[in-house]
Every structure is written in structure tokens, then in C-alpha cells.
Amino acid sequence: PEAINSLAIHQSKVVYDTLFEASWETLQSFGKAKEMQMGMIAVLHTWGQQLSLHPHLHCIVPGGGVDKNGQFKNSHFKGNFLFPVKALSKVFRAKFCEKLKAKSPVKYEQIRQDLWRKPWVVFAKKPFGSPKSVVEYLGRYTHKIAISNHRIKSIDEQNVTFDYKDYRM
């Protein structure tokens, strides 16, 4: 949410560490309920399509976890999703806020109402079709520059004009 942007500018380590910790703990708690040890690869992104500050993670999670016998166990909630997305969103927000409050109590109190005003959305995608798809996805987020050449429409002495997707519309 936008409420963490000013904190991300002034206390970036706090925000970024909290994103990773809350994500991992959320995933682990859902896995534990199904008696699975989960895994995750997470990549931090600090900007959005419009190049505005938008700290968020892109996480790749296997379609299951390791059970108490050391065996991989596939798991699905409904359709192709591992866990219920609305529940993930609620638990993630609670864990993020709890950790932020512990690390930066004064700032947390300043933005607390904004953090709880709207629901948070954990975006989930259907599973990748192949290992190649996983590598391509990771490549887009680990080797990406802010404005790739295909988005640039014009450049002059003072301006760069580029295309972007407005995800809020």
C-alpha cells in the first residue's frame, strides 16, 4: 500500500526486510497447517510501471511442500492455487503490520490507519507450465531495467516519453 512509501524512502531496510519476513512467515504458516515445509524464491522490486516507488516482492512457490517423511507433497486449494488468496492476503497484512510495529513503532502509529483501511491483495498466478517458464519469469524480474527500450517512445534534450500499464484502472 501507498502508506509504506514514505517509510520505504527513509527506512528502506526496515520495509524491505519486513516484506521478506512477513512473506516467508505467511507461507510457512499456511504450509504448517497442511503439515508441509514450504520453499520460496523472492525477488524485491522497488518500482512500478510508472517508475514510482512501489516496493513489492515477486515470489515463486512450489505447488506443495516437503512432508514429515521428507517427501514432496503436491497440494491445491481450489482450482490451481496452493492456498486461498484472500486468506493469504489477510495473514500477510497482519504479519507485516505486526513486524513493522515492532521495528518502527512511532512510524507505524503514524500510518496504522492507512495500513488497515483497505484490504491488501496478494496476487497469485496459476502454476508455470514448465521449468523454462520459471526461468523466463525470474529473468524478467532479476535482469530488468526500469525502462526497457521497447517502452521508450521518444527522447529529446529534456524528456523521455515511455509507455506504461496503469494497473489501477
Report each predicted region and the residues it spans.
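Beta->alpha loop/short-helix hinge microenvironment recognizer with preference
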Residues: 1-169
